[in-house]
Amino acid sequence: MDFREEYKQKLVSADEAVKLIKSGDWVDYGWCTNTVDALDQALAKRTDELTDVKLRGGILMKPLAVFAREDAGEHFCWNSWHMSGIERKMINRGVAYYCPIRYSELPRYYRELDCPDDVAMFQVAPMDAHGYFNFGPSASHLGAMCERAKHIIVEVNENMPRCLGGTECGIHISDVTYIVEGSNPPIGELGAGGPATDVDKAVAKLIVDEIPNGACLQLGIGGMPNAVGSLIAESDLKDLGVHTEMYVDAFVDIAKAGKINGSKKNIDRYRQTYAFGAGTKKMYDYLDDNPELMSAPVDYTNDIRSISALDNFISINNAVDIDLYGQVNAESAGIKQISGAGGQLDFVLGAYLSKGGKSFICLSSTFKTKDGQVQSRIRPTLANGSIVTDARPNTHYVVTEYGKVNLKGLSTWQRAEALISIAHPDFRDDLIKEAEQMHIWRRSNR
């Protein structure tokens, strides 16, 4: 069947398409790399006509046009599934709010929401010969999002990579209300946050020493996971697999070094499985039309049952800080939301259930405040208002540049002792004093 005629019938300008949106509507803006561009600019032109339009999305990679005006909050409200630096600034302006989620559950949220989307709009790759628009590197929850949306608008971007996968990786033209051809902006890029530091490299070495041949990898975003990836690429490891929430540049380096073939994976053999990808153009070019990659919905990639089915699963993630009980905060600085819960807990739990699996929470032992003060990331208790991303019974390995400790099965005093042993030496005595006051320190430890 030739879908070109239907394409012509549904093709409209961005200005025409956004006329579907009314005051009070819920509107999905896409996710990460396929957040709308031309449609965002078109909706911004209608600001004065609209009130209480509730927008949903996450991991914004550039500022939105609808929030350019100072009074934008009187017309639009941003609801984020996961915060980027841009969204943190929007929270400070009072125009954005975080939606706490367990990322693996997000498709179900959409299928059961009391307030489904009035309009869902997002960027896609050009239509293929079969009438499908590929979601690009963001299968994630988009299929579920489209199922209950009253109207769907796709913004075609010729630069969007066509990402192959299993299910829910695109939408058929028959399900689309309008098609908009945008200006084909470059896909938003997300770097690793600068080159790896000596601390990053020290942590990476401690983790790589724990990775066996044939392991299946999950890497988070940031300097430390990328440092781990670089070290793996230079190592003698072989027959590695990938099953991850987020595909990052480090995986490209590991794959091109010949370390990844997926031959030992118990499921999805020979495929690198991921829910969404965000990185540099190098990564997008690698993802494009690559049959080795498998883009999949997040309720599959992050399902504990999927993760635990893969032997020797190695999960590597960052944290903001951790307390002496082993509670991990990976998303906030006190009451200030930094990122989101994402799928970290899913992988912490799934990796431990995997035969031979291990979960690593990595962090530098210290950080500097804006006024130059050095503080410990290992704290007696989390700061007031900080979020517990991973509860203490779930925390497995914790790694700093001073060592790695396994918290599973340890009592409170053993946990305190273990964590203090990998804290920066300048803070250990103070941590011991705090542990004594908390009644989780035994004098015989000294």
Curated annotation (Swiss-Prot):
GO terms for biological process: acetate metabolic process; acetyl-CoA metabolic process; butyrate biosynthetic process. It catalyses: butanoate + acetyl-CoA = butanoyl-CoA + acetate; propanoate + acetyl-CoA = propanoyl-CoA + acetate. Its EC number is 2.8.3.-. Keywords: Fatty acid metabolism, Lipid metabolism, Transferase. InterPro entries: AcetylCoA_hyd_C (IPR026888), AcetylCoA_hyd_C_sf (IPR038460), ActCoA_hydro (IPR046433), ActCoA_hydro_N (IPR003702), Butryl-CoA_acetate_CoA_Tfrase (IPR023990), NagB/RpiA_transferase-like (IPR037171). CoA binds at G220, I221, G222, G223, M224, V320, G343. One of its GO terms (molecular function) is acetate CoA-transferase activity. Optimum pH is 7-8. Coiled coil: none annotated. Pathway: Lipid metabolism; butanoate metabolism. It holds the Pfam family AcetylCoA_hyd_C. The active site is at E245 (5-glutamyl coenzyme a thioester intermediate). The fermentation acid butyrate is of special interest, as it has been shown to serve as the preferred energy source for the gut wall and also influences cell differentiation and apoptosis in the colon, and this seems to aid in protection against colon cancer and inflammatory bowel disease. Formation of butyrate via butyryl-CoA CoA-transferase is the only available route for butyrate synthesis in the majority of human gut isolates. HAMAP family: But_acet_CoA_trans (MF_03227), But_CoA_trans (MF_03228). Coenzyme A-transferase that converts butyryl-CoA to butyrate. Can also use proprionyl-CoA as substrate in vitro. Belongs to the acetyl-CoA hydrolase/transferase family. Butyryl-CoA CoA-transferase subfamily. This is Butyryl-CoA:acetate CoA-transferase.
